[in-house]
């Protein structure tokens, strides 16, 4: 690291601590040339995920879009914001763990729906109705029937 005062590249680490919920390391350094102390942060570098949309366009993955969609789906429902954060985090890490750099928006939606189903079924239907673009009530009812069938199987 270059010293911010004299630009020397010779420094020693005086102190190291976890920062940002252990996603980074904060280091206090001292320049061996001029004695100036300064702080550096070390973060894990993750490669960007690219979302391939339905129309074939590509854009950078933004976790905020998932979170915003979940918040809208869960309005006036007994779902805590932390649960939505947890779903968003799980989806992001599932995508990153897949090893792919390009992910279809369809795959992202499926990951979200699979996790949301276990949190709140009404919110799941709301999310699915936007994600799956139901054209009529029959499609909505078919989705709800799938939930009922899953519930009956899990009760057995």
Swiss-Prot record:
Protein name as catalogued: Transcriptional repressor NrdR
Organism, scientific name: Staphylococcus haemolyticus (strain JCSC1435)
Role: Negatively regulates transcription of bacterial ribonucleotide reductase nrd genes and operons by binding to NrdR-boxes.
Family annotation (NCBIfam families): transcriptional regulator NrdR
Domain ATP-cone span(s) in chain numbering: 49-139
ZnF region ranges: unnamed: 3-34
InterPro entries according to UniProt: ATP-cone_dom, NrdR-like_N, RNR_NrdR-like
Gene Ontology terms for molecular function: ATP binding; DNA binding; zinc ion binding
Signal sequence interval, chain numbering: none
Lineage: superkingdom: Bacteria
PANTHER family to which the protein is assigned, alphabetical: TRANSCRIPTIONAL REPRESSOR NRDR (PTHR30455:SF2)
PROSITE patterns (UniProt xref): ATP_CONE
Keywords: ATP-binding, DNA-binding, Metal-binding, Nucleotide-binding, Repressor, Transcription, Transcription regulation, Zinc, Zinc-finger
The keyword Zinc-finger is assigned to this record: yes
Cofactor annotation comment: Binds 1 zinc ion.
């Amino acid at each position: 690291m270059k010293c911010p005062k004299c630009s020397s590249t010779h420094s020693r680490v005086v102190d190291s601590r976890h920062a940002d919920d252990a996603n980074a390391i904060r280091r206090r350094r001292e320049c061996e040339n001029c004695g100036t102390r300064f702080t550096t942060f070390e973060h894990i570098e993750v490669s960007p995920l690219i979302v391939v949309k339905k129309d074939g366009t590509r854009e950078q993955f933004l976790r905020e879009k998932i979170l915003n969609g979940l918040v809208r789906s869960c309005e006036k429902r007994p779902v805590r914001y932390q649960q939505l954060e947890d779903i968003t985090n799980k989806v992001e890490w599932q995508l990153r763990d897949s090893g792919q750099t390009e992910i279809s928006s369809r795959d992202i939606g499926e990951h979200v729906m699979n996790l949301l189903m276990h949190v709140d079924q009404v919110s799941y239907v709301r999310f699915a109705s936007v994600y799956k673009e139901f054209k009529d009530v029959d499609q909505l009812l078919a989705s709800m029937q799938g939930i009922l069938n899953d519930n009956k199987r899990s009760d057995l």
